[in-house]
Amino acid sequence: MALAVVTAAVVVAGGATVATRLVADRQSERGAGRITAAPTPSPAAPSPTPTPGADVTGPLNLLLVGVDTRVSVPGWEPHGDAVLVAHVTRGLDRAYLFSLPRDLLVDIPAYPKAGYRGGKTKLTHAMSYGSRVPGKPKQPSTTQGYELLRSTVSGYTGLRFDAGAVVTFSGFEKLVDAVGGVDLYVDQRTVSLHRRPDGRHRDPAPSGGGYVGPQMVYAKGERHLNGWQALDYARQRYGLDGGDYARQRHQQQLIRALMTKMQAEGLPRQPDRVEQVVGALGDTLVYAGGPRIVDLAYALGGLPADRLVLVGLPGEGVGRGSAYRGEQLKPVGRQFLTALEEGRAEQYLADHPELVVKR
Protein backbone atom coordinates (compact mmCIF):
# COMPACT_ATOMS: atom_id res chain seq x y z
CA MET A 1 0.00 0.00 0.00
CA ALA A 2 2.35 2.70 -1.17
CA LEU A 3 3.12 4.89 1.73
CA ALA A 4 0.89 2.54 3.04
CA VAL A 5 -0.31 4.15 0.46
CA VAL A 6 2.25 6.82 0.85
CA THR A 7 1.06 6.20 4.15
CA ALA A 8 -2.37 5.95 2.97
CA ALA A 9 -1.93 3.71 3.47
CA VAL A 10 -0.66 6.47 4.46
CA VAL A 11 -3.25 8.43 3.91
CA VAL A 12 -5.30 9.73 3.72
CA ALA A 13 -6.29 9.81 2.67
CA GLY A 14 -4.43 10.96 3.60
CA GLY A 15 -3.00 12.22 4.87
CA ALA A 16 -0.73 9.40 5.20
CA THR A 17 0.98 10.20 9.93
CA VAL A 18 2.89 9.81 13.16
CA ALA A 19 3.82 6.78 15.21
CA THR A 20 4.04 4.85 18.44
CA ARG A 21 5.60 1.43 18.64
CA LEU A 22 7.38 1.01 15.37
CA VAL A 23 9.50 -1.80 14.08
CA ALA A 24 12.64 -0.10 15.34
CA ASP A 25 11.11 0.22 18.81
CA ARG A 26 10.19 -3.45 18.83
CA GLN A 27 13.72 -4.44 17.87
CA SER A 28 15.13 -2.25 20.64
CA GLU A 29 12.81 -3.89 23.17
CA ARG A 30 13.82 -7.37 22.02
CA GLY A 31 17.48 -6.51 22.50
CA ALA A 32 17.07 -4.73 25.83
CA GLY A 33 19.42 -6.00 28.52
CA ARG A 34 21.70 -7.83 26.10
CA ILE A 35 25.26 -6.74 25.39
CA THR A 36 26.86 -8.09 22.25
CA ALA A 37 30.48 -7.57 21.30
CA ALA A 38 30.95 -5.60 18.12
CA PRO A 39 32.22 -7.80 15.27
CA THR A 40 35.77 -7.32 14.09
CA PRO A 41 35.82 -5.40 10.79
CA SER A 42 36.67 -7.56 7.80
CA PRO A 43 38.41 -6.48 4.61
CA ALA A 44 36.10 -8.77 2.66
CA ALA A 45 33.89 -7.47 -0.13
CA PRO A 46 31.09 -5.15 1.04
CA SER A 47 27.77 -6.78 1.88
CA PRO A 48 24.99 -6.36 -0.67
CA THR A 49 22.56 -3.54 -0.03
CA PRO A 50 19.58 -4.95 1.90
CA THR A 51 16.17 -4.86 0.23
CA PRO A 52 14.17 -1.81 1.40
CA GLY A 53 11.64 -2.75 4.05
CA ALA A 54 13.31 -6.07 4.86
CA ASP A 55 12.90 -5.41 8.59
CA VAL A 56 9.22 -4.41 8.37
CA THR A 57 7.09 -7.22 9.76
CA GLY A 58 3.39 -7.67 10.46
CA PRO A 59 0.96 -7.27 11.92
CA LEU A 60 0.89 -3.49 11.54
CA ASN A 61 -1.63 -0.91 12.66
CA LEU A 62 -1.53 2.44 10.85
CA LEU A 63 -3.41 5.58 11.84
CA LEU A 64 -4.30 7.85 8.93
CA VAL A 65 -5.54 11.38 9.60
CA GLY A 66 -6.79 14.08 7.27
CA VAL A 67 -6.88 17.50 8.91
CA ASP A 68 -8.54 20.81 8.23
CA THR A 69 -5.96 23.44 9.20
CA ARG A 70 -7.64 26.53 7.68
CA VAL A 71 -4.27 27.90 6.60
CA SER A 72 -5.97 31.21 5.78
CA VAL A 73 -6.66 31.71 9.49
CA PRO A 74 -3.46 32.35 11.52
CA GLY A 75 -3.14 30.01 14.49
CA TRP A 76 -6.09 27.83 13.47
CA GLU A 77 -6.00 24.58 15.46
CA PRO A 78 -6.03 21.42 13.30
CA HIS A 79 -9.13 19.23 13.54
CA GLY A 80 -9.21 15.52 12.72
CA ASP A 81 -11.64 15.73 9.81
CA ALA A 82 -10.97 12.15 8.62
CA VAL A 83 -9.73 9.40 10.92
CA LEU A 84 -8.95 6.01 9.36
CA VAL A 85 -7.24 2.89 10.64
CA ALA A 86 -5.45 0.32 8.47
CA HIS A 87 -4.63 -3.08 9.95
CA VAL A 88 -2.15 -5.19 7.98
CA THR A 89 -2.01 -8.91 8.80
CA ARG A 90 1.08 -10.75 10.00
CA GLY A 91 2.06 -11.93 6.54
CA LEU A 92 1.62 -8.44 5.03
CA ASP A 93 -0.75 -10.07 2.54
CA ARG A 94 -4.10 -8.60 3.60
CA ALA A 95 -5.26 -5.32 5.10
CA TYR A 96 -8.46 -3.96 6.60
CA LEU A 97 -9.31 -0.27 6.36
CA PHE A 98 -12.05 1.34 8.42
CA SER A 99 -13.06 4.83 9.48
CA LEU A 100 -14.10 6.27 12.81
CA PRO A 101 -16.75 9.02 12.73
CA ARG A 102 -15.28 12.47 13.32
CA ASP A 103 -18.11 13.06 15.82
CA LEU A 104 -17.59 9.74 17.63
CA LEU A 105 -18.15 10.25 21.35
CA VAL A 106 -14.95 9.09 23.06
CA ASP A 107 -12.91 9.47 26.22
CA ILE A 108 -9.98 11.74 25.43
CA PRO A 109 -7.21 11.17 27.99
CA ALA A 110 -5.45 13.93 29.87
CA TYR A 111 -2.52 15.41 27.97
CA PRO A 112 -0.37 17.60 30.25
CA LYS A 113 1.90 18.69 27.39
CA ALA A 114 -1.01 20.72 26.01
CA GLY A 115 -2.57 21.52 29.37
CA TYR A 116 -5.60 19.32 28.60
CA ARG A 117 -7.21 17.57 31.57
CA GLY A 118 -9.18 14.98 29.66
CA GLY A 119 -12.88 14.53 29.03
CA LYS A 120 -15.62 12.82 27.02
CA THR A 121 -16.33 14.58 23.72
CA LYS A 122 -16.12 14.21 19.93
CA LEU A 123 -13.09 12.46 18.45
CA THR A 124 -12.32 15.34 16.07
CA HIS A 125 -11.48 17.56 19.06
CA ALA A 126 -8.60 15.36 20.23
CA MET A 127 -6.41 16.74 17.45
CA SER A 128 -7.11 20.36 18.33
CA TYR A 129 -6.88 19.92 22.11
CA GLY A 130 -3.56 18.13 21.78
CA SER A 131 -2.13 20.72 19.38
CA ARG A 132 -2.22 23.53 21.93
CA VAL A 133 1.19 24.72 23.07
CA PRO A 134 1.10 26.54 26.44
CA GLY A 135 2.39 30.07 26.05
CA LYS A 136 2.07 29.94 22.25
CA PRO A 137 -1.66 30.30 21.51
CA LYS A 138 -1.15 31.00 17.80
CA GLN A 139 1.38 28.24 17.16
CA PRO A 140 -0.44 24.88 17.30
CA SER A 141 1.61 21.69 17.02
CA THR A 142 0.28 19.09 14.58
CA THR A 143 2.65 16.50 16.04
CA GLN A 144 1.25 17.04 19.54
CA GLY A 145 -2.28 16.90 18.17
CA TYR A 146 -1.55 13.59 16.53
CA GLU A 147 -0.12 12.17 19.75
CA LEU A 148 -3.32 12.85 21.67
CA LEU A 149 -5.51 11.63 18.81
CA ARG A 150 -3.45 8.44 18.58
CA SER A 151 -3.80 7.80 22.31
CA THR A 152 -7.54 8.42 22.07
CA VAL A 153 -8.05 6.05 19.12
CA SER A 154 -5.84 3.43 20.75
CA GLY A 155 -7.91 3.59 23.92
CA TYR A 156 -11.16 3.25 21.99
CA THR A 157 -10.11 0.46 19.60
CA GLY A 158 -7.66 -1.45 21.77
CA LEU A 159 -5.06 -1.25 18.97
CA ARG A 160 -1.45 -0.11 19.40
CA PHE A 161 -0.25 1.85 16.40
CA ASP A 162 3.00 1.16 14.58
CA ALA A 163 2.97 4.16 12.27
CA GLY A 164 0.70 6.75 10.79
CA ALA A 165 0.38 10.02 8.93
CA VAL A 166 -1.31 13.38 9.07
CA VAL A 167 -2.03 15.13 5.79
CA THR A 168 -3.69 18.49 5.20
CA PHE A 169 -6.34 19.11 2.57
CA SER A 170 -3.79 20.71 0.25
CA GLY A 171 -1.40 17.81 0.82
CA PHE A 172 -3.99 15.27 -0.26
CA GLU A 173 -4.70 17.32 -3.39
CA LYS A 174 -0.98 17.37 -4.22
CA LEU A 175 -0.69 13.63 -3.64
CA VAL A 176 -3.47 12.79 -6.09
CA ASP A 177 -2.06 15.15 -8.72
CA ALA A 178 1.42 13.67 -8.22
CA VAL A 179 0.16 10.30 -9.48
CA GLY A 180 -1.91 11.77 -12.32
CA GLY A 181 -5.33 11.53 -10.71
CA VAL A 182 -7.41 8.49 -9.76
CA ASP A 183 -10.19 6.41 -11.30
CA LEU A 184 -13.15 5.96 -9.01
CA TYR A 185 -16.75 4.75 -9.05
CA VAL A 186 -18.99 7.52 -7.66
CA ASP A 187 -21.75 5.57 -5.93
CA GLN A 188 -24.29 8.40 -5.66
CA ARG A 189 -24.81 11.85 -7.12
CA THR A 190 -22.79 14.23 -4.98
CA VAL A 191 -23.21 18.01 -5.02
CA SER A 192 -20.27 20.03 -3.70
CA LEU A 193 -20.80 22.50 -0.91
CA HIS A 194 -17.33 24.01 -1.41
CA ARG A 195 -16.34 24.14 -5.10
CA ARG A 196 -17.54 25.52 -8.41
CA PRO A 197 -17.43 23.37 -11.57
CA ASP A 198 -14.17 25.08 -12.58
CA GLY A 199 -12.52 24.21 -9.27
CA ARG A 200 -12.67 27.67 -7.72
CA HIS A 201 -13.92 27.93 -4.16
CA ARG A 202 -17.50 29.10 -3.79
CA ASP A 203 -18.04 32.51 -2.20
CA PRO A 204 -19.19 32.77 1.43
CA ALA A 205 -22.86 33.69 1.77
CA PRO A 206 -23.30 37.43 2.54
CA SER A 207 -25.51 36.60 5.50
CA GLY A 208 -22.88 34.26 6.93
CA GLY A 209 -23.01 30.48 7.10
CA GLY A 210 -22.81 28.51 3.87
CA TYR A 211 -21.76 29.47 0.36
CA VAL A 212 -23.25 30.85 -2.84
CA GLY A 213 -22.59 30.32 -6.53
CA PRO A 214 -22.50 27.40 -9.00
CA GLN A 215 -21.74 23.98 -7.53
CA MET A 216 -19.58 21.15 -8.78
CA VAL A 217 -21.61 17.97 -9.25
CA TYR A 218 -20.14 14.45 -9.26
CA ALA A 219 -22.52 12.25 -11.26
CA LYS A 220 -22.94 8.59 -10.39
CA GLY A 221 -20.69 6.27 -12.40
CA GLU A 222 -17.04 5.67 -13.25
CA ARG A 223 -15.06 8.91 -13.00
CA HIS A 224 -11.47 10.14 -13.29
CA LEU A 225 -10.74 12.71 -10.59
CA ASN A 226 -7.81 15.11 -10.38
CA GLY A 227 -6.44 16.42 -7.09
CA TRP A 228 -8.97 19.12 -6.25
CA GLN A 229 -11.88 16.96 -7.40
CA ALA A 230 -10.79 13.98 -5.30
CA LEU A 231 -10.36 16.18 -2.24
CA ASP A 232 -13.67 17.93 -2.79
CA TYR A 233 -15.54 14.67 -3.33
CA ALA A 234 -14.03 13.18 -0.17
CA ARG A 235 -15.15 16.16 1.92
CA GLN A 236 -18.85 16.08 1.08
CA ARG A 237 -21.38 14.74 3.59
CA TYR A 238 -24.41 17.03 3.43
CA GLY A 239 -27.17 15.87 1.12
CA LEU A 240 -25.76 12.35 0.85
CA ASP A 241 -27.72 9.20 1.56
CA GLY A 242 -25.83 8.13 4.66
CA GLY A 243 -24.39 11.53 5.57
CA ASP A 244 -21.00 11.30 7.26
CA TYR A 245 -20.99 7.51 6.99
CA ALA A 246 -21.24 7.84 3.20
CA ARG A 247 -18.35 10.30 3.31
CA GLN A 248 -16.27 7.78 5.27
CA ARG A 249 -16.96 5.20 2.58
CA HIS A 250 -15.93 7.62 -0.15
CA GLN A 251 -12.66 8.38 1.64
CA GLN A 252 -11.87 4.68 1.91
CA GLN A 253 -12.66 4.16 -1.77
CA LEU A 254 -10.29 6.99 -2.66
CA ILE A 255 -7.48 5.40 -0.69
CA ARG A 256 -8.01 2.15 -2.56
CA ALA A 257 -8.09 4.05 -5.86
CA LEU A 258 -4.79 5.73 -4.91
CA MET A 259 -3.32 2.37 -4.02
CA THR A 260 -4.42 0.89 -7.34
CA LYS A 261 -2.89 3.79 -9.28
CA MET A 262 0.41 3.71 -7.39
CA GLN A 263 0.79 -0.02 -7.80
CA ALA A 264 -0.02 0.15 -11.51
CA GLU A 265 2.95 2.50 -11.87
CA GLY A 266 5.18 0.39 -9.62
CA LEU A 267 5.66 3.36 -7.29
CA PRO A 268 5.97 1.42 -4.00
CA ARG A 269 9.01 -0.47 -5.34
CA GLN A 270 10.77 2.70 -6.55
CA PRO A 271 12.33 4.25 -3.42
CA ASP A 272 13.69 7.29 -5.26
CA ARG A 273 10.27 8.10 -6.68
CA VAL A 274 8.57 7.62 -3.32
CA GLU A 275 11.01 10.12 -1.81
CA GLN A 276 10.25 12.58 -4.62
CA VAL A 277 6.50 12.33 -4.01
CA VAL A 278 6.92 12.72 -0.25
CA GLY A 279 9.31 15.64 -0.75
CA ALA A 280 6.79 17.38 -2.99
CA LEU A 281 4.22 17.24 -0.19
CA GLY A 282 6.51 19.25 2.09
CA ASP A 283 4.99 20.27 5.41
CA THR A 284 1.50 19.27 4.28
CA LEU A 285 2.47 15.73 5.39
CA VAL A 286 3.59 14.83 8.91
CA TYR A 287 5.11 11.37 9.32
CA ALA A 288 7.15 9.80 12.09
CA GLY A 289 8.03 6.25 12.78
CA GLY A 290 10.65 3.56 13.10
CA PRO A 291 10.71 2.45 9.45
CA ARG A 292 11.55 4.99 6.81
CA ILE A 293 8.58 5.82 4.66
CA VAL A 294 10.30 4.22 1.64
CA ASP A 295 10.79 0.99 3.62
CA LEU A 296 7.15 0.92 4.67
CA ALA A 297 6.02 1.55 1.11
CA TYR A 298 8.31 -1.15 -0.30
CA ALA A 299 7.29 -3.73 2.30
CA LEU A 300 3.60 -3.17 1.59
CA GLY A 301 4.03 -2.70 -2.16
CA GLY A 302 3.23 -6.34 -2.86
CA LEU A 303 -0.22 -6.15 -1.29
CA PRO A 304 -2.78 -6.28 -4.13
CA ALA A 305 -5.50 -3.64 -4.07
CA ASP A 306 -8.15 -6.37 -3.96
CA ARG A 307 -6.64 -7.57 -0.68
CA LEU A 308 -7.38 -4.21 0.94
CA VAL A 309 -10.76 -4.84 2.55
CA LEU A 310 -12.84 -1.72 3.15
CA VAL A 311 -15.01 -1.97 6.24
CA GLY A 312 -17.97 0.30 7.00
CA LEU A 313 -18.77 0.51 10.70
CA PRO A 314 -22.41 1.59 11.23
CA GLY A 315 -23.21 4.13 13.91
CA GLU A 316 -25.98 6.25 15.34
CA GLY A 317 -26.44 9.57 17.07
CA VAL A 318 -26.30 10.06 20.82
CA GLY A 319 -29.09 12.49 21.67
CA ARG A 320 -31.17 14.53 19.23
CA GLY A 321 -31.57 18.16 18.26
CA SER A 322 -30.05 20.53 20.79
CA ALA A 323 -29.27 17.51 22.99
CA TYR A 324 -27.11 15.87 20.29
CA ARG A 325 -23.74 14.89 21.76
CA GLY A 326 -22.10 12.94 18.97
CA GLU A 327 -22.03 9.48 17.39
CA GLN A 328 -21.58 5.97 18.71
CA LEU A 329 -20.85 2.74 16.86
CA LYS A 330 -23.56 0.11 16.82
CA PRO A 331 -22.74 -3.21 18.55
CA VAL A 332 -21.86 -4.93 15.25
CA GLY A 333 -19.21 -2.25 14.68
CA ARG A 334 -17.75 -2.41 18.19
CA GLN A 335 -17.59 -6.19 17.96
CA PHE A 336 -15.57 -5.90 14.73
CA LEU A 337 -12.92 -3.96 16.65
CA THR A 338 -12.75 -6.76 19.20
CA ALA A 339 -12.46 -9.37 16.45
CA LEU A 340 -9.69 -7.35 14.78
CA GLU A 341 -7.73 -7.10 18.01
CA GLU A 342 -8.09 -10.85 18.56
CA GLY A 343 -7.11 -11.78 14.99
CA ARG A 344 -10.61 -12.91 13.97
CA ALA A 345 -11.43 -10.17 11.45
CA GLU A 346 -11.68 -12.43 8.39
CA GLN A 347 -14.17 -14.79 10.03
CA TYR A 348 -16.13 -11.93 11.58
CA LEU A 349 -16.61 -10.27 8.19
CA ALA A 350 -17.61 -13.60 6.68
CA ASP A 351 -20.34 -13.71 9.32
CA HIS A 352 -21.25 -10.04 8.76
CA PRO A 353 -20.75 -9.42 5.02
CA GLU A 354 -22.90 -6.27 5.19
CA LEU A 355 -19.91 -4.47 6.74
CA VAL A 356 -17.71 -4.96 3.66
CA VAL A 357 -17.71 -2.06 1.18
CA LYS A 358 -18.15 -3.69 -2.22
CA ARG A 359 -16.66 -1.11 -4.57
Q: Locations of the language-model features?
A:
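Non-catalytic, solvent-exposed segments at the cell envelope interface
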Residues: A2-A4, A13-R359
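Hydrophobic helical h-region of N-terminal Sec-dependent signal peptides
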Residues: T7-A8
